[in-house]
Amino acid sequence: MNVYIYYVIFAFIISLISGAVLIPVIIKFCRKRKLYDLPDTRKVHRMMIPRLGGIAFLPSMLFAFIVSLFVLSRVLGGMEVTIGLWSCAFIVSIFIIYSVGVVDDLIGLGPKVKFLAQTLSALLLPLSGLYINNLYGFLGIWDVPFYIGAPLTVFVIVYIDNALNLIDGIDGLAGGLALMSLFGFLLCFMREGVWTYCVLISGLIGVLVAYLYFNIFCKPESNRKIFMGDSGSLTLGFVLGFLFVKFAMDNSKVMTYRSDSLLLSYTLLIVPCFDVVRVMLSRLWAGQPLFKADKRHIHHKLLRCGLSQHCALASI
């Protein structure tokens, strides 16, 4: 067995424990401060639910990543981590997105402020050298110059970030889709031998599993149920957008050339990405505002067919 797999497993366990410890603390804090997601005619839930579950995501992921590399490198050795410009840009970007999500959950922010923060955060990545530089023959296009790849990268990351945020409408949906996508990217990077990213992804998977337990299986009456809020959905979406660009980028120094990299990356995110396009086109056709919340998402349609939240989640 490859010794690096122990790093991945250890990061998952550390993050899982961290999430299991942090989330109950967050629930108590939300109830004390009365920080709830209030029900309305558009939302599915009918009781006040704490909404700050996503606060646990980034600290747990980074804690698991750092501890795994520090502890196991001393015990097992072999893994070296270099902090390059890409890494610095990602860390700064994810902290911006995470902070915006937390502030939005606490006091509320307008969509323009969040969109600006997403755009600026995404822009840091191509400025650091990480951008979509090859379409691998899609529409007959191969190599992509920076002046096209940079705005395309920003668009893709913001698009994915908002797609996951907008589909967060029933218990476990955004988290479940993100979990499957993260697991897919984990296998992709594992196959390419890019173990540093595998450890990072595993660190996010662990806390996400802990969150999904509280979100899906805990009843509101138990006072243990929680939503991820924008702090969670925006963070997850941005990480997935970053992984999309990282895996799709043609960089022989990091990974072997694969003509299906772009297609595979999109396939892992096809449900939220396709749903947001379908909803936008539907609103456009109906002459309604594109960004006004409604009940046009796929989970709303399944619920109207008589499915329960858990059945709709399983169907999607």
Residue spans of the language-model regions?
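Membrane-helix interface "capping/anchor" motifs
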Residues: 103-111, 165-173, 221-223
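A generic, lipid-embedded transmembrane alpha helix
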Residues: 50-70, 123-127
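Alpha-helical transmembrane segments
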Residues: 2-28, 32-34, 61-73, 79-95, ...
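Function-critical hydrophobic alpha-helical transmembrane segments in multi-pass membrane proteins
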Residues: 151-161, 173-174
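Membrane-interfacial loop-to-helix junctions in multi-pass transporters
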Residues: 88, 143-153, 260
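Short juxtamembrane and helix-loop transition motifs at transmembrane-helix boundaries
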Residues: 17, 41-45, 73-83, 132-142, ...
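Juxtamembrane helix-capping/reentrant segments at transmembrane boundaries
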Residues: 38-52, 224-229
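Hydrophobic alpha-helical hairpins/lids featuring a short glycine-rich hinge
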Residues: 84-120, 125
